[in-house]
């Protein structure tokens, strides 16, 4: 029997927007416990997004949330070993995991970009995700295509 699951920790909302989602994103962005630096990077990235997309009617937080929703995957493939063969079985993703995957993908592909500061890279990735482009969006589409290709094995889900 497995151990009991640990309790979920309460995540405090951030000071500027009052959003727990922002705090989760910043926690993923943070290195070495430097949360204030991560918040500064995030807020300056949102300011740069606001400058780049000045013709949009939405606020910078709404643009970021829309970009995050654009790169949120719906299905993923998991390896299942059945009868000596390994199958890529498409499975739906739980809502919390969807959010975590999209945040981590956005940060990962922002870090891989060329640019001077992390705020520049993150703002460029947010703009690309908002426009359904960029590395994080491509990753989501690749996951969807792989699940689509392997949907014949969906009955192996347990």
Curated annotation (Swiss-Prot):
GO terms for molecular function: rRNA binding; structural constituent of ribosome; tRNA binding. InterPro entries: Ribosomal_uS7 (IPR000235), Ribosomal_uS7_bac/org-type (IPR005717), Ribosomal_uS7_dom (IPR023798), Ribosomal_uS7_dom_sf (IPR036823). GO terms for biological process: translation. NCBIfam families: rpsG_bact. The keyword tRNA-binding applies. Keywords: Ribonucleoprotein, Ribosomal protein, RNA-binding, rRNA-binding, tRNA-binding. It comes from Azobacteroides pseudotrichonymphae genomovar. CFP2. The keyword Ribosomal protein applies. One of the primary rRNA binding proteins, it binds directly to 16S rRNA where it nucleates assembly of the head domain of the 30S subunit. Is located at the subunit interface close to the decoding center, probably blocks exit of the E-site tRNA. It holds the Pfam family Ribosomal_S7. The gene is rpsG. Part of the 30S ribosomal subunit. Contacts proteins S9 and S11. Gene3D superfamilies: Ribosomal protein S7 domain. This is Small ribosomal subunit protein uS7. It comes from the Bacteria. One of its GO terms (cellular component) is small ribosomal subunit. Belongs to the universal ribosomal protein uS7 family.
